[in-house]
Amino acid sequence: MMNVLVTGGAGYIGSHVVEELQKNGFTPIVYDNLSTGHAAAVPEEVQLVEGDIHDVAFLKHIMARFEIDAVIHFAASSLVGESMENPSKYYFNNVEGSLHLLEAMKGAVVDYIVFSSTAAVYGEPESVPIKEDSCLKPTNVYGRTKLMIEKMLADYDMAYEMRYVALRYFNAAGASPSRDIGEDHDPESHLIPLVLKTAQGVRRQVAIYGTDYATADGTCVRDYVHVCDLATAHVLALKHLLAGGASRVYNLGSENGFSVREIIDAAKKITGIDFTVVEESRRSGDPAVLIASSEKIRDELGWVPKCSTVNEVISTAWKWHKGHPQGYEG
């Protein structure tokens, strides 16, 4: 049985990956400072180590103590707007934090890492669907930090033979149907939980930012991928590395685009609630259409999304939000 350190494993995507690791016979050890994660998202039988990504000595100690074989790295700050207002926080937490993690891995002789990257590394795409060799022109600090980490990983691979898989997510959504975990951010910035919180009455209204885009209904189109499908991809990437596979970069998306209006209409149908929607002006830096090509990971690792239909994504998220109107706190 192999031991996997999951940094940020008490967070939204990390907690779902912990579940998938357990299903596949791995032993996850969660390393999280709980600044945005939730201890309640970590199963009782899983070791939760409360620690900071910048503490190289403690990281090395934990890697040695638990005989860590590989790392899956989620720990990061991830609010696009905040990254533009407070870039120092993002370069410190994301770039310097990842450097500290890599140094701890090097010192502890841990040679495999799966990295949580983002479609934000592409910026405004020149064409869709977006492939891994598309231009990398991030338009915000968050995306730039993730791209810098990808470059660091490539350099560590070249210099120290530390193998990696970087996974560029599109829009993660949904919740586990088998465990009581879901999406709980403060502040919340993702469309589907915002919509569902409005349906619950936790929020007064949900806003559409821009209705004059060059799309079928004038609103932005995004590629939504179920968090459980993302979790499966992480385990496939890990198995690829442990089997001696070379370093890789993959997109993770459903390859289907849905507009903001389509998501809102689907949520109204699934919840049976006609909540208030308001129209606002565009936000700067929002591309009209972002849709992934996941052909590369499908061809190389056999990853196929199994539950990333809009109905499945919204239905599983709605079930979790109904049971947790105040998130993990209530």
Which residues are covered by each model-predicted region?
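N-terminal Rossmann-like NAD(P)+-binding domain of SDR-like oxidoreductases, especially those catalyzing
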Residues: 1-175
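Short, flexible, glycine-rich and Lys/Arg-enriched loop motifs at helix boundaries
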Residues: 39, 170-191, 201-222
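Pocket-edge positions in alpha/beta enzyme catalytic cores
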Residues: 51, 63, 90, 183-187, ...
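The catalytic Tyr-centered alpha-helix of NAD(P)H-dependent dehydrogenases
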Residues: 127, 138-145, 184-191, 223-227
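C-terminal substrate-binding subdomain of Rossmann-fold SDR/epimerase-dehydratase oxidoreductases
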Residues: 194-330
